[in-house]
């Protein structure tokens, strides 16, 4: 009884303190609202103009797109209508190439080999951890919800799929890391293609054939050989920036420049200036971004097929992917950021709002890269040495949303075909989905191409990818947003873990500047002593 009586006053005291705290905060909020002036409102709107305009563009674009759907616009009319959005994509893609190269070179050059090695290891561990978690979430969600229940005969198919083997895709990934021509890597990447070739195969002789009497020699040759057709891999290329090759080269180049000390100073200054110039161009393009996003979203909604085809299994598949991406983006990534940094992840994510909306509109993590740089460095104050190193690499190889989608979609296709996967096959899917997401380019709908590798690894029919193409344009935007969020939070985590190395580097740079100035002083004094004294002209001489 005594214990319960003692607890009641404590509970009452806590409730009173809580109520007092709520009252104080309410009064403070009222005072702030009452003290607001027109200037305060204007300054707030000006500071958040980009975000407000971008959010408005998404809402207006969605409404406009659905409003224009009943007019059944032709393909040509849709292309004309989407032209402002196409211009935005072109502007952003124009800046991606110089931005990746300049940011990586300057980022690596600003770090010593020890710091860059530690930072690189932390970034890789983060990338692999989040990608594996995303794959596991995708597999668990699709097994629990089971969206593929039923048959595939009633499902809508769209498009054709190009076959590719897992071995060739993996070798292409390695080949693209080492481009033979850097100029060509700016607009082309290696891709194995297949062509049909005929081979003459000798037929083993048997007793019947040996016993036969053949008078004609040519007839004998035709009898002893047969023609076999086979699809063989041949070297090829596809249009598009070889981002992986440029990332590898830029990192190595920046590392070498950083170790060249004074000899590399001119190159460091050049790439620093280039990076600064690109970021100023980004600041200009950001004002056009809301208009471009509006027409991109509206045009895509007008262009999409009849909503009637998205029913049953496909609707459940769409819901399953959205749930998986939400769990990863809203719960896992912020929780990981909080556990490592002990900071509020939602404040950090708030500074990324425009980058996330741009990713939703453009459906390309590479095209969003300039905006992501701007948001992280200006809104969230992330060290430029971190963003220049982590973001270009992350936009190339860290694709959490793509990995989740590929694992989930592969098991969905297995369910549609009533194909029971064992534990070993699920592990195979998880490994290949992780590897395939690394090789997926940061371009729209790149996940569909790498999906072939995942399906081939467990013997699933690759033609069934056509079952999910109808909704991929929408899911691709959500995947891209998740990818950009993962890269950005990764930059924040790596900065927190590398703060001591960055401080030490700042101290070293400060000491080196002081030493240089001290070294210059004796020479300046000697030069001053050796200078002949100039006669001082008086006013009379001047006159």
Swiss-Prot record:
Taxonomic classification: Eukaryota, Metazoa, Chordata, Craniata, Vertebrata
Residues modified to Phosphoserine: 512
Annotated glycan sites: 206, 216
Residues in the bilayer without spanning it: 346-376, 426-459
Residues where Na(+) 1 binds: 394, 398, 483, 487
Residue ranges of the TM segments: 48-68, 87-108, 123-145, 237-260, 270-297, 319-340, 386-412, 473-494
Positions of region (Disordered): 522-543
Superkingdom field: Eukaryota
Naturally occurring in which organism (per UniProt): Mus musculus (Mouse)
Subcellular location: Cell membrane
Protein name per its UniProtKB record: Excitatory amino acid transporter 1
């Amino acid at each position: 009884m005594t214990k319960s009586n003692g607890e009641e006053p404590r509970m009452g005291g806590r409730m009173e303190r809580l109520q007092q705290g709520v009252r104080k905060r309410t009064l403070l909020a009222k005072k702030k609202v009452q003290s607001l002036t027109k200037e305060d409102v204007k300054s707030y709107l000006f500071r958040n103009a980009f975000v407000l305009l971008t959010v408005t563009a998404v809402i207006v674009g969605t409404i406009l797109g659905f409003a224009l759907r009943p007019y059944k616009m032709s393909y040509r009319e849709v292309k004309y209508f989407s032209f402002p959005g196409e211009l935005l994509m072109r502007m952003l893609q124009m800046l991606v190439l110089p931005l990746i190269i300049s940011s990586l070179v300057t980022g690596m050059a600003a770090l010593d080999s020890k710091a860059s090695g530690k930072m690189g290891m932390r970034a890789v561990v983060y990338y692999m951890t989040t990608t594996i978690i995303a794959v596991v979430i995708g597999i668990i969600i699709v097994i629990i919800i089971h969206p593929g229940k039923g048959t595939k005969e009633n499902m809508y198919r769209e498009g054709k799929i190009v076959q590719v083997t897992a071995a060739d895709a993996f070798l292409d990934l390695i080949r693209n890391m080492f481009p033979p021509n850097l100029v060509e890597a700016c607009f082309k990447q290696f891709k194995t293609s297949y062509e049909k070739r005929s081979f003459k195969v000798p037929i083993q002789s048997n007793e019947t054939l040996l016993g036969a009497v053949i008078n004609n020699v040519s007839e004998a040759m035709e009898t002893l050989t047969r023609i076999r057709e086979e699809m063989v891999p041949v070297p090829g290329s596809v249009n598009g920036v070889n981002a992986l090759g440029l990332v590898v080269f830029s990192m190595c180049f920046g590392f070498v420049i950083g170790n060249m000390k004074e000899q590399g100073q001119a190159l460091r200054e050049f790439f620093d200036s280039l990076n600064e110039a690109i970021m100023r161009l980004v600041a200009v393009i950001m004002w056009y971004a809301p208009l471009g996003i509006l027409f991109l979203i509206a045009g895509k909604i007008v262009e999409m097929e009849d909503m009637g085809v998205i029913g049953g299994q496909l609707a459940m598949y769409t819901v399953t992917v959205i749930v998986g991406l939400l769990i990863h983006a809203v719960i896992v990534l912020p929780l990981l950021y909080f556990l490592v940094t002990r900071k509020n992840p939602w404040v950090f994510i708030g500074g990324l709002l425009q980058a996330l909306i741009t990713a939703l509109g453009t459906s390309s993590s590479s095209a969003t890269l300039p905006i992501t740089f701007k948001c992280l460095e200006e809104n969230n104050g992330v060290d430029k040495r971190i963003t220049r190193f982590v973001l270009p690499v992350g936009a190339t190889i860290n694709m959490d949303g793509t990995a989740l989608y590929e694992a989930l979609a592969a098991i969905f296709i297995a369910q549609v075909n009533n194909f029971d996967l064992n534990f070993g096959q699920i592990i195979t899917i998880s490994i290949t989905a992780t590897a395939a997401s690394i090789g997926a380019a940061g371009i729209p709908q790149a996940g569909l191409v790498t999906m072939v590798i995942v399906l081939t690894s467990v013997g699933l029919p690759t033609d069934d990818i056509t079952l999910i193409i109808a909704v991929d344009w929408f899911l691709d935007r959500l995947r891209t947003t998740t990818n950009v969020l993962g890269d950005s939070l990764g930059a924040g985590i790596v900065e927190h873990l590398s703060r001591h190395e960055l401080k030490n580097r700042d101290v070293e740079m400060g000491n080196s500047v002081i030493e240089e100035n001290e070294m210059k002083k004796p020479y300046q004094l000697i030069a001053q002593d050796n200078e002949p004294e100039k006669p001082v002209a008086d006013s009379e001489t001047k006159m």
